């Protein structure tokens, strides 16, 4: 009986040692990852709105509160990190006017961006008879009459960072790019096809992660 008790005690002691050894190894791995992360100090991706081709931008209704628009934009993203990759798990692009969304979101396919890599996307963003707030409808009509409309091209999504073989959890990504559309002078753009106008911006965007 005594031998059985000693055997059971030794077994429990061995299990405890194995358990704490595993905890210690996991702690060392976690600490190593944190140190690598702190040393590398990942930087946010840099976005530039290169251009926008306007195919349609019409306000209708009485009062004017229905907006139909169709753009194709060119958006570039650069990973400034030397040793950190970026996974874009989701990225939805859309346009806003005075903080109100005026187009449907367009999803960009998930992609991986390596060190110092640059990706360029050219999605279409559009909306058909999108209701806008009455005061925004009046302001939009006025801005068009004055010749210039300021839109904000936004991209919202989620990213993950890759350090070596370690991949972080998901982080929210928010991108805002100002786009001044000059309706009063089409000479500022390039005529594309029958009635589309392409405007070049090379505008740096604000990025938050």
UniProtKB/Swiss-Prot annotation:
CC per GO annotation: plasma membrane
Compartments (UniProt record):
Cell membrane
Glycoprotein: is it a keyword of this entry?
Answer: yes
Induction cue = Induced by infection with the cucumber mosaic virus (CMV-Y and CMV-B2 strains).
- Glycosylated residues, per the record, are 58
Query: Chief subcellular site?
Result: membrane
State whether keyword Manganese applies.
Answer: no
Among Pfam families, the record links this protein to: LEA_2
User: Tissue-wise, where is it found?
Assistant: Expressed in rosette leaves, cauline leaves, stems, and siliques, and at lower levels in roots and flowers.
- What is the recorded function of this protein according to its Swiss-Prot or TrEMBL entry? May play a role in plant immunity.
Q: Which PANTHER family match?
A: LATE EMBRYOGENESIS ABUNDANT (LEA) HYDROXYPROLINE-RICH GLYCOPROTEIN FAMILY PROTEIN-RELATED, OS05G0367900 PROTEIN
Q: What is this protein called?
A: NDR1/HIN1-like protein 1
Organism of this sequence: Arabidopsis thaliana
The organism's lineage?
A: Eukaryota, Viridiplantae, Streptophyta, Embryophyta, Tracheophyta
Q: Which gene encodes it?
A: NHL1
């Amino acid at each position: 009986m005594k031998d059985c008790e000693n055997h059971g005690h030794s077994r429990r002691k061995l299990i405890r040692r194995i358990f704490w050894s595993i905890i210690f190894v996991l702690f060392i791995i976690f600490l190593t990852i944190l140190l690598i992360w702190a040393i590398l100090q990942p930087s946010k991706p840099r976005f530039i709105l290169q251009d926008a081709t306007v195919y349609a931008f019409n306000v209708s209704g009485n009062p004017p509160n229905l907006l139909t628009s169709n753009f194709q934009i060119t958006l570039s993203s650069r990973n400034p990190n030397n040793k950190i990759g970026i996974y874009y798990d989701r990225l939805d692009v859309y346009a806003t006017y005075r903080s109100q969304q005026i187009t449907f979101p367009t999803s960009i396919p998930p992609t991986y961006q390596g060190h110092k890599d640059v990706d360029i996307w050219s999605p279409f963003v559009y909306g058909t008879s999108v209701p806008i707030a009455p005061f925004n409808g009046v302001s939009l009509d006025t801005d068009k009459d004055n010749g210039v409309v300021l839109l904000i091209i936004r991209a919202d999504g989620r990213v993950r960072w890759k350090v070596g073989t370690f991949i972080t959890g998901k982080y929210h990504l928010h991108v805002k790019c100002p786009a001044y559309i000059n309706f009063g002078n089409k000479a500022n753009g390039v005529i594309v096809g029958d009635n589309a106008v392409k405007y070049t911006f090379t505008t740096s965007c604000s990025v938050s992660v």
